[in-house]
Amino acid sequence: MDKFQGYLEFDGVRQQSFLYPLFFREYIYVLAYDHGLNRLNRNRSIFLENTDYDKKYSSLIVKRLILRMYEQNRLIIPTKDLNQNSFLGHTSLFYYQMISVLFAVIVEIPFSLRLGSSFQGKQLKKSYNLQSIHSIFPFLEDKLAHFNYVLDVLIPYPIHLEILVQTLRYRVKDASSLHXFRFCLYEYCNWKNFYKKKKPILNPRFFLFLYNSHVCEYESIFFFLRKRSSHLRSTSYEVLFERILFYGKIQHFLKVFVNNFPAILGLLKDPFIHYVRYHGRCILATKDTPLLMNKWKYYFVNLWQCYFSVWFQSHKVNINKLSKDNLEFLGYLSSLRLNPLVVRSQMLENSFLIDNVRIKLDSKIPISSIIGSLAKDKFCNVLGHPISKATWTDSSDSDILNRFVRICRNISHYYSGSSKKKNLYRIKYILRLCCVKTLARKHKSTVRAFLKRLGSGLLEEFLTGEDQVLSLIFPRSYYASKRLYRVRIWYLDILYLNDLVNHE
């Protein structure tokens, strides 16, 4: 990290909070398009999650862009001239895209250095496993079984660009950088309006940074409120003076009544709360009463509306009781299941039965939503009946088969943690029969005649890797029994979800 700071000459810049001069350094562009910062902080930074941006780099283009940045009047061009004006063979839109990517990289630097310093002296073992989507499910299976309620929160987005600028002002004190940031945002709106009839213009790295910085600011305030309100859960976080007075009373209360009223102290302990954020949602699991869950619900509403100036309605926060309601989480339907367990005990000549109930988190496959996705992409109809994929009939037989096999294995790989595999087998059946119908349609034949000509070897291609591994690990009798039907496997190599059709 020290070597990296010296290379960037960033110590003096960071002390003065001046980031704008870095826009005129050529090696910063090398860093942006060579993934240097991403390789250095691969296991540390939470802001470098997406590297799917333009990797093209040319020193000549960079020098031209820096010259244009010195000549500010030539950089600002009306929206109607974005497509016509060009500078040495490149449109102005190309340079705006470069500036937006560069801005995301430059502003990531102080966040990455600050986050890296917080991990100094700490050993993170197997941190790559924590990057997997499946890594959260074993944690929830261990924790949610002891909780009662879950808050399912839809994180709101600010509808005005100035809210994003104001949020970033708490982290970046450089006025010039904030002006460049505001310039990129408003120019993006001009691009969006100008190209609204064409393919939309996206900059994943730039907008990923905006989203992460926005959520990071919200979470920092939320965790502060969580710590400050743990002993005073019924008092609003806005009444600070009453809270300070109440803390003094708590200290006196603990000293006087600690020996006489030990049961009352349970009300003053911090509640067990677990917070998980995924995609555009977050969940808050706790073992509180319905009254306290409603208080947490309006905590979120007041936080977004009063501090972030974002209109946030209470119906976007759902209170789910785990014993009755299903929690839709990362493509799974999770709920608590009671597993009765009868234990026979014998003492001397007397024997008796003990009924125990074990609470377990049950994760199931949302078959209706998956069938809806398959029907949307023309693999089946809305009832789940397989149909031929007409748009793929122009491809070769091997290409069609490989596409279906890849989709089938990806779905089977992701939903291997389901407690019941019946719905997974139904999805496999839909994809297999859709593949056969597509090939039969291409060869202008019926499904029966096509299978009779090729034999059953075609369907063996859909045998997933985990099926092959389990058949080697477990005995044949166990593999053929229903016990393997309940085997749950969580993989720690799933870092993102692929598109159903377009992923290659």
Curated annotation (Swiss-Prot):
SS bond list: none
GO cellular component, one term: chloroplast
Taxonomy, superkingdom: Eukaryota
GO biological process, alphabetically ordered: mRNA processing; RNA splicing; tRNA processing
One Gene Ontology molecular-function label: RNA binding
UniProt keyword Lipid biosynthesis present: no
Main location: plastid
The keyword Ribosomal protein is annotated on this UniProt entry: no
Localization, UniProt: Plastid, Chloroplast
Record-linked Pfam families: Intron_maturas2, MatK_N
Keywords: Chloroplast, mRNA processing, Plastid, RNA-binding, tRNA processing
Function in brief: Usually encoded in the trnK tRNA gene intron. Probably assists in splicing its own and other chloroplast group II introns.
Family to which the UniProt record says this protein belongs: Belongs to the intron maturase 2 family. MatK subfamily.
Protein name: Maturase K
Organism: Turritis glabra (Tower mustard)
Protein encoded by which gene: matK
